[in-house]
């Protein structure tokens, strides 16, 4: 399948990264990006976006994939305001925000979304997003984009545990460890599995370490049911603040979120990111423009910025693997220090789009009946 080719390519990148690190890093000679925009066309887009004056985003926490720097750089570079909606929203919430604001051009209507891989096709099928091909389109792998430009991959990471070792010095090394009584009242997901892509995929990943497979996510639901019955699962949406205070000592999240959290903590509290020893699970996110975007030119400019070399490297600074990584490596534009920051996630598996869709449906429809934990945002 096409998606499986993407997965092979992405895993190949990881191997290539380790080889580069061992050999002293990539070359530093810069080459122009593929499909660089024509100066006049880009100037027209910038002018049109500045006339709109604003971009409305949703579900972009500043500590997620370095979005804080991404947003501030965009604002400074182009002089636009950025209206940030619900930074802790899940992918399902993002689509619902578009549905609810079809006829609203006010501040609650998002221009752009960043959602889990399977949510891109859902959004297209429902007519919630519009096509736009960025100028670096050709350097995005074919398997990671809708051929008509409705959505395209932006970055990927691997699910991990971020552990406040000041509160819990005994770090879990694998999913099964989370059932140990020592973690009573200490483990939380980073979203609601009924709506959040990250939480859904965390449940999906648990199936791999508990007798399931990419074609069978049921053991993941069963595992979380046991975790809930044991009292170890806390029904709160974990974030870095809750990890820092010790209210949630063990957060299940993408590796890039955990690594950026540790940078933020600056040693207080001490913390570690653990890539599970089995069931390593990787996930791709995708970008798209709302079909009802109040600021369509600002949305297009945002996409151009994200998929420029500058934007891709900002994501990488936040420990994410940008989707144009292969092109960036080939042209030698990635600084050695960025390559050295990325963790070893060898052995991670990428589900196909069909597998993701099946797991998504199973988990969202059966979480309440099987697990019974009403996961909510922290008061």
Briefly describe each language-model feature range.
Residues 56-72, 83-99, 106-247, 261:
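Extracytoplasmic ligand-binding site segments that recognize negatively charged/polar headgroups
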């Amino acid at each position: 399948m096409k998606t499986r080719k993407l997965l092979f390519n992405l895993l190949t990148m990881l191997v290539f990264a380790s080889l580069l690190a061992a050999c002293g890093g990539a070359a530093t000679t810069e080459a122009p990006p593929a499909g660089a925009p024509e100066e006049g066309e880009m100037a027209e887009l910038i002018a049109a976006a500045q006339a709109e004056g604003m971009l409305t985003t949703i579900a972009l926490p500043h500590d997620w994939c370095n979005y804080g720097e991404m947003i501030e750089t965009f604002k400074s570079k182009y002089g636009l305001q950025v209206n940030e909606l619900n930074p802790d929203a899940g992918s399902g919430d993002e689509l619902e925000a578009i549905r609810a604001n079809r006829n609203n051009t006010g501040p609650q209507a998002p221009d752009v979304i960043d959602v889990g891989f399977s949510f891109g096709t859902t959004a297209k099928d429902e007519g919630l997003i519009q096509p736009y091909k960025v100028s670096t389109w050709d350097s995005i792998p074919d398997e990671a984009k809708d051929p008509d430009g409705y959505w395209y991959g932006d970055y990927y990471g691997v699910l991990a545990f971020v552990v406040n070792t000041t509160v819990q010095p005994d770090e879990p090394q694998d999913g099964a460890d989370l059932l140990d009584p020592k973690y009573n009242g200490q483990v939380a997901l980073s979203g609601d599995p009924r709506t959040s892509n990250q939480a859904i995929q965390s449940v999906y990943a648990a199936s791999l370490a508990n007798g399931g497979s990419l074609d069978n996510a049921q053991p993941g639901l069963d595992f979380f049911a046991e975790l809930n019955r044991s009292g170890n699962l806390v029904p709160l949406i974990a974030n870095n603040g809750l990890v820092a205070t010790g209210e949630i000592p063990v957060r299940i999240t993408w590796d890039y979120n955990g690594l950026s959290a540790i940078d933020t903590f600056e040693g207080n509290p001490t913390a570690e990111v653990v890539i599970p020893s089995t069931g390593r699970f990787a996930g791709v996110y995708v970008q798209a423009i709302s079909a009802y975007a109040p600021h369509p030119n600002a949305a297009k400019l945002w996409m151009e910025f994200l998929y420029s070399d500058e934007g891709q490297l900002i994501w990488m600074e936040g420990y994410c693997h940008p989707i144009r990584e292969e092109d960036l490596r080939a042209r030698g534009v990635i600084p050695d220090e960025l390559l050295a920051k990325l963790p070893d996630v060898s052995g991670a598996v990428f589900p196909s789009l069909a597998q993701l869709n099946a797991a998504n449906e199973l988990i969202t429809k059966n979480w309440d009946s099987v697990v019974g934990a009403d996961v909510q945002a922290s008061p």
